[in-house]
Amino acid sequence: MDPNTVSSFQVDCFLWHVRKRVADQELGDAPFLDRLRRDQKSLRGRGSTLGLDIETATRAGKQIVERILKEESDEALKMTMASVPASRYLTDMTLEEMSRDWSMLIPKQKVAGPLCIRMDQAIMDKNIILKANFSVIFDRLETLILLRAFTEEGAIVGEISPLPSLPGHTAEDVKNAVGVLIGGLEWNDNTVRVSETLQRFAWRSSNENGRPPLTPKQKREMAGTIRSEV
């Protein structure tokens, strides 16, 4: 087994333990707690795959971190923090487009993980573009603020938004939700394209026809769920 794989797992286990102690003292906010739960599941899976005991790995991770901290100067820590890139906020929509109220003649709604998908199934034979406002870090989508579907006339006919009760989502969550929304709109013979900005940072690529490169799994989910649920 690669020793770097083992040491990475050990450090991750110890850092999770530290974050758990922070949560136990009621110092973590909702996104912090959400990531804590997600990472716990991930560590259990990694431990099972690697055949490593989490408690033993946590102790070993503590020793690694303590050794690094002894060697770390305050100046080096400041330089490390300064070199971490900050999130960027990208906007496809204007403030008016984001805040505008809209209604649906035939409303449909689906919850996909931590995201809520809404669309008007009365819309047919329209050209539709999906626009989104979101944050980016390391040139990848970090957090979706809001996504809306617009007709050429500017009418809002669909939306994807984070659920306040389930904070925290991944780029994969967003891509899956976009796939469901596209499938629902295309079911009524609409032509849907995704903004170049969203394609670039969510899928790391773009197509001239505005369609993101959905995986076979996403295409199956679109076809299987949209008929009955959206």
UniProtKB/Swiss-Prot annotation:
One of its GO terms (cellular component) is host cell cytoplasm. Residues 1-73 are annotated as: RNA-binding and homodimerization. Residues 205-230 are annotated as: Disordered. Changing residue 108 to A: No of ISGylation of band II form. Keywords: Eukaryotic host gene expression shutoff by virus, Host cytoplasm, Host gene expression shutoff by virus, Host mRNA suppression by virus, Host nucleus, Host-virus interaction, Inhibition of host innate immune response by virus, Inhibition of host interferon signaling pathway by virus, Inhibition of host PKR by virus, Inhibition of host pre-mRNA processing by virus, Inhibition of host RIG-I by virus, Inhibition of host RLR pathway by virus, Interferon antiviral system evasion, Isopeptide bond, RNA-binding, Ubl conjugation, Viral immunoevasion. Gene3D superfamilies: Influenza virus non-structural protein, effector domain, S15/NS1, RNA-binding. Its main location: host cell. Residues 223-230 are annotated as: PABPN1-binding. Changing residue 41 to A: Complete loss of inhibition of RIGI CARD ubiquitination. Pfam families: Flu_NS1. Residues 180-215 are annotated as: CPSF4-binding. It is found in: Host nucleus; Host cytoplasm. One of its GO terms (molecular function) is identical protein binding. Residues 218-230 have a biased composition (Basic and acidic residues). Belongs to the influenza A viruses NS1 family. Homodimer. Interacts with host TRIM25 (via coiled coil); this interaction specifically inhibits TRIM25 multimerization and TRIM25-mediated RIGI CARD ubiquitination. Interacts with human EIF2AK2/PKR, CPSF4, IVNS1ABP and PABPN1. This is Non-structural protein 1. It comes from Influenza A virus (strain A/Puerto Rico/8/1934 H1N1). The gene is NS.
